[in-house]
Amino acid sequence: MSTQKQIRNIAIIAHVDHGKTTMVDQLLRQSGTFADHEKVVDTVMDNNAIEKERGITILAKNCAVTWEGTHINIVDTPGHADFGGEVERALSMVDGVVLLIDAQEGPMPQTRFVTKKALALGLKPILVVNKVDKPGARPDFVVNAAFDLFDKLGATDEQLDFPVVYASGINGWSSLEEGAPGEQWGPDMSALFNTVLKHVPAQKGDPAAPLQLQISALDFSTFVGRIGVGRISQGTIKPMMDVVVMEGPDGKAIKGRVNQVLTFQGLERVQATEAGPGEIVLINGIADLNIGVTVTDSANPAPLPMLKVDEPTLTMNFCVNTSPLAGREGKFVTSRQIWDRLQKELQHNVALRVKETDEEGIFEVMGRGELHLTILLENMRREGFEMAVSKPRVVMKDVDGEKFEPIELVTADIEEQHQGGVMQALGERKGELVNMEPDGRGRVRLEYRIPARGLIGFTNEFLNLTRGSGLISNIFDSYEAHKGDIGGRKQGVLISMDDGEIFTYALGKLDDRGRMFVRANDPVYEGMIVGIHSRDNDLVVNATRTKQLTNFRVSGKEDAIKITPPIELTLEYGVEFIEDDELVEITPKSVRLRKRHLKESDRKRASR
């Protein structure tokens, strides 16, 4: 009987690259989830193409293992504040959290965000110090830093009394003892499994009570339609059972019938004849499933309050592509197709907001950060969409007639030699130094509070200032009074004056004017940005110029044209680079930059 099933529900929290997905791989392997004949893929939890490429987790996902007769549901949470909507939903399904921290780096801002949410929900943490076998590991420092972090985030005394497990995800072992560096500890992950069984509370719901199942995530299948994922708080659910769906206690009760009930086993979804309290289930057959609704008993409805999600902090305009090259590379180019795709995204991307503007073909899309919105753009681009987007703007709040803006907490890990340049750049962007911590090995950690506006476009500058050796991460802190104007881009751009194809001869002539974004034989059009000017003003250039051929021969060989390689234009770079009067043109094959007004005369008129 499912009512007697021993269940534990845990979420795994970690900063990017601290080893969370590798750790989950090991838990699946060692619990016997993969049969001997199965091929085990690395990073099984990152199953979205962009997640695998970037090594980040975007979508909250579930898997389950069985250890000593107990069914353990593992929810993989995104470590990034931009996917906070995913985080909040994932945490609503669990009773405990495993906080995974790199033994060398210590707690990072993204970890802080998810941990704060988990502690506020009253979840008890288990600290896993990962990668303890790597050189430079500082397990003691990490445990103390985690304690200080929990204390700062308002943890209770019970939450501060957390168990610690030392582990190496890649080598597949864990231990409750710190041991000497280089010493081989426990042979497997049993120390971590046993800690979870001991410290994560078992489900206390009554299987005979009216059903309460809150939907925390949605999936879609072409065969069965919408699929809801959530945890049963109380009661029992069975296939073909009549239920009602309610949006919180004041919501209208919509009748429905459950078709199938599935549970997680490893990475697979298996059909169940019934499921009881504590189980994370997937149900289908009900059309009105949305995130946060409660599926409850039709005779005695017992709805739960709707899930709360933080409001968006950043907004962008998505527009129909109106450039002369529009429609050549994409399959979906009309405003109706873009609008329908954004509406579909809203069904499962709860932190997103979309609204129509007064101008035809322009939609305002609000999200939790630059990464949140550029991942959506990248997904749409891969699906065959073509569009143009504006520079991101922050979402201001009006408090008693005064303008308030979002403030971010930034942590930068840099080499000491780059400290001056980075501090100057953050200072110019209205950043306030909160903390500075040298690690005694030539690197220093800077903590700043800075308006979110000041961070738009800062990533590229930061990488240049630190020669690619710096690490930076940021997290939303609070809304505060507007901090005043922040300067824009320091350099102007090179703008094409004509439609056509760019030639090597023209590139050679423009080489000393600045850095180019285009290569020989690329198509260009009037108003397209072809490069960065070496000065602070915009310059209109002839990018389609060819060499005039005459019937005179010249003595000596012609000079070889020297061309500096162009800047690789990515979607993120483009979105960070542009100013208010510019757009990024996105197609499945290309990313181009352009002026909002393509003709020089229109630009002059608009600037008056």
Describe each region flagged by the PLM.
Residues 212-316, 326-328, 491, 499-550, ...:
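Conserved nucleotide-binding/hydrolysis modules and their immediate coupling elements
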